[in-house]
């Protein structure tokens, strides 16, 4: 058979078919993607038979042309959305799930999804630290749908997702419905406030996925005696909030009923100690997933620390907002644009600020202010709104919907300032943030890192401003040692400072702060509500100060010398351009006057004036006591300075030295005793080497990354509560309370174990040994089964019984046949005339129907569909029984017996 020559003409669609002989990934993707028509590529025509004279040269030209085409494709695809190698396609998901992910709008997995999904598909327990908005919901929903695949005909649920609130559970259900659209998986929502009977029906329909709050799910577990042995996949969403809201007892009881072969996932914004203990008890060799960006301070973040007095703290905050950050007062640009859009739009909006807010983003003035308690949040919000700022606020006990609205306003740029507590800000993720203000200085360096980690992201610069009182100085020194940066007080250095690499401390300009302090004093005198909020905030701060973590002993010793130094009250170098030399001298004089302490007590003054009100030996005792205190103070101050000088601390903590130099330094020290141990036989309690690689090699675990205990030790961070409840600032001080019924003091434990009386307060021990409410077993499920005529529910592993239920609403729709007159149109709407014509037409149809003789038969036919008029055997039996009872009651003979 003779060979055919290659046709010099291009294909019908002007595509060179010779490329198909050398199929590559780029060529196939180019075929699938519609593109513009191009000219025939004459350089790519291939001589298949090799009849050409330049065989080797042709191959080289062909290869070069292919490479040029590939480079051209890559350059043309820049800036377009393409399927990347690191996308969801590389995770090994099925086609239906990939289609649902694409329909949802996800193209590339987020960092938490990229790290979590492969581990979950590998059947490993995971503890993920992720904030709200980081894509954590899809991180556990996508592998769950991939593993469950389709509905199981065997009875028993296979996945359980526990959420702290109803709103979060609804969001999770929405994501599960959207991503599981291509499957026949059944999912149910079990939250408080819904009908128990409906939830009995949902559970009887054999759902695959249960999304619930812990309280209601435990109620159903006890009431229905649920067997959870079929559950393979458990998720604790927002686990830190689960523990904060008091669900620890319910979680322990639920965890006890789950099989040991389950896979458990735990997602949290922070990692408290109680959560670490729960994870160690309930998870099997968990892996901690933590994004590095959340644990480090950005090198682009610049820090400023301002020393203030307690009475000037509000004025200092107003000065920072007005003069340093320069936040404008009044309505924001985003709010003005939203109002303009509402004004020019034809349809009336329910909310003025939500018309086009999703296109906005935080501005360069966006600032988060961190406070200690929820009372400080209310107090500062009132002050700042009175000052004219656009403010949002959030704290732990704020309603979920209100919190979402407030945070969304800040994200959209409608407000410039967000006042929050550490507990409320734990799961908030702001994409672009310029400034962070620590109104109350954090008690742990980790909390400081957690706060300021929200700014200076993605290569952008940011600022953090902290207000430091004298009582906060030890915590500031702890932070300085934690960061390993030198401490600079005031303007002592006299050189250009780098605020990103140094801890620079100084005061604010006194005259400017005084103006805002006077304004605050006037406001407190005029506004009674703000004055009351201030008193409540002071009381809350006292409780907070009692329960916050204490600073290290060395920092407490060093803090006294730092506060008493002259540089402590010097103006911060940030205000170098504002104050002149004369102003600096004025500041020094005011600082000396402010720190003045009299040398004599009232006893010496009275003795010098010749007063005889006190015995003469009182002044001698006072003199001796004062001299002794002075000697003690001088000795302690000298001892403190010798133990912890600035240079020694910088050398020790910022720049660690090798063991050889330390040994030389120690041998030259005169106060150290000589060591008599023999190095050949002596075994020290400290490791001989500091090699991290050597420690990993000797370790019995597979690696430090998989060792949850070691990883969680670094990530653990306890946040103090933001309100004075028993779960917020610690246990109540008194362990007794007054019982009105018994007329005596009783132990508070009675409130916890249910022994204070009343059936509603009784507690019983569950399967795990913890006490749960006795009202969980009320018999309503038995009554529901009796009403539905269900003898026995199928057991786990048996085939599901048909007709038990259809799961969540969404099956057969109810058809409403009720005819209702249209509403009276609103005169102020733009479509008033249109609605008015509709109303008149409806009235005309109703009038015609009333005078139409055929409409009655039609109406009768419609109503006859609802209820049959034929009586059943049971109806006839009941009617006869009622008639017989009526006869006996009346005691009259029948009409037939009258004629006899």
Curated annotation (Swiss-Prot):
SUPFAM superfamilies: P-loop containing nucleoside triphosphate hydrolases. Its EC number is 3.6.4.13. Residues 748-762, 819-851, 866-877 have a biased composition (Basic and acidic residues). Coiled coil: none annotated. Residues 117-289 form the Helicase ATP-binding domain. Residues 878-900 have a biased composition (Basic residues). This is ATP-dependent RNA helicase DBP10. The lineage of its organism: Eukaryota, Fungi, Dikarya, Ascomycota, Pezizomycotina.
